C-alpha cells in the first residue's frame, strides 16, 4: 500500500504504526526528504523543530497525524482516505481551531471510547430472560449517538460543534464525485488576492472575502 513512498515519524508516534508503514512497503527517511511527515503530538520537540523550519513557514512541509495510516489500514487504500482531514497544526493553531470546531477528526476515538463506557454491552446471560423486542430496543438505544444518560454517567468528552467542511468526520464529497478543473491553481495566502483571515464566534466559516 505504501510502496515507493517515504515518511518521517516523530518520536511521539507508536512503534506499531511505524511497523505497519514498513510492512506495507513504505520507507523511512529524514523529514527533509520524506514525502509524508507524521506526528501524534504537536508539542513534541522533533515536531516543533519542523514547525519552526523555513520549509514549514513557506508551506513546503505539512505534518499529519499518524491516525491517517490507521484509517487506511481497514480500507487497504491511501486514496480512499482524505489526508487533508489529518493535518496536525501547531498547538496554538489547534487551540484557535478547537474554539470553533470542537475537536479534530483524530480525536473522535475519544468519543467512541466514552460512548462505550456509557453504554457497555450487556452480558448475554442477563438478556436471556428478556424478550427479543426489549433487546432490540436496548441495541437501538446504544446505537443512538444522542443517548440520554444518567447524571452518574456523565461523559467528559467535548461536544461536536460546527465541524468545518474541509475537515469533516463523515459526509465529505469523494474525489471521484468532484468536477474537474482545468484552470490555473493558486495557493490561498492571507492578505493576498483580496482575501483575509478573521475569527468569528458565529457558526459561519472563518474565511471571508473582502468587500469590493
Curated annotation (Swiss-Prot):
Transmembrane segments: none annotated. GO terms for cellular component: chromosome, telomeric region; nuclear inner membrane. One of its GO terms (biological process) is homologous chromosome pairing at meiosis. Pfam families: TERB2. Meiosis-specific telomere-associated protein involved in meiotic telomere attachment to the nucleus inner membrane, a crucial step for homologous pairing and synapsis. Component of the MAJIN-TERB1-TERB2 complex, which promotes telomere cap exchange by mediating attachment of telomeric DNA to the inner nuclear membrane and replacement of the protective cap of telomeric chromosomes: in early meiosis, the MAJIN-TERB1-TERB2 complex associates with telomeric DNA and the shelterin/telosome complex. Belongs to the TERB2 family. Component of the MAJIN-TERB1-TERB2 complex. This is Telomere repeats-binding bouquet formation protein 2. It comes from Danio rerio. The lineage of its organism: Eukaryota, Metazoa, Chordata, Craniata, Vertebrata.
Amino acid at each position: 500500500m505504501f510502496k515507493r513512498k517515504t515518511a518521517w515519524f516523530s518520536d511521539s508516534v507508536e512503534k506499531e504504526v511505524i511497523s505497519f508503514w514498513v510492512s506495507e512497503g513504505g520507507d523511512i527517511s529524514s523529514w527533509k526528504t520524506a514525502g509524508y511527515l507524521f506526528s501524534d503530538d504537536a508539542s513534541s520537540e522533533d515536531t516543533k523543530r519542523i514547525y519552526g523550519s523555513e520549509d514549514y513557514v513557506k508551506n513546503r512541509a505539512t505534518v499529519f497525524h499518524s491516525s491517517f495510516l490507521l484509517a487506511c489500514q481497514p480500507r487497504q487504500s491511501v486514496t480512499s482516505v482524505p489526508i487533508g482531514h489529518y493535518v496536525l497544526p501547531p498547538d496554538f493553531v489547534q487551540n484557535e481551531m478547537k474554539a470553533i470546531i470542537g475537536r479534530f477528526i483524530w480525536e473522535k476515538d475519544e468519543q467512541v471510547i466514552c460512548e462505550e463506557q456509557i453504554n457497555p454491552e450487556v452480558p448475554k446471560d442477563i438478556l436471556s430472560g428478556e424478550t427479543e423486542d426489549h433487546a432490540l430496543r436496548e441495541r437501538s438505544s446504544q446505537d443512538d449517538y444522542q443517548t440520554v444518560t444518567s447524571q452518574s454517567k456523565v461523559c467528559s468528552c467535548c461536544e461536536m460543534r460546527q465541524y468545518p467542511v474541509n475537515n469533516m468526520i463523515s459526509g465529505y464529497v469523494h474525489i471521484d464525485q468532484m468536477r474537474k478543473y482545468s484552470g490555473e491553481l493558486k495557493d490561498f495566502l492571507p492578505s493576498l488576492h483580496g482575501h483575509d483571515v478573521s475569527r468569528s464566534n458565529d457558526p459561519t466559516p472563518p474565511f471571508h472575502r473582502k468587500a469590493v
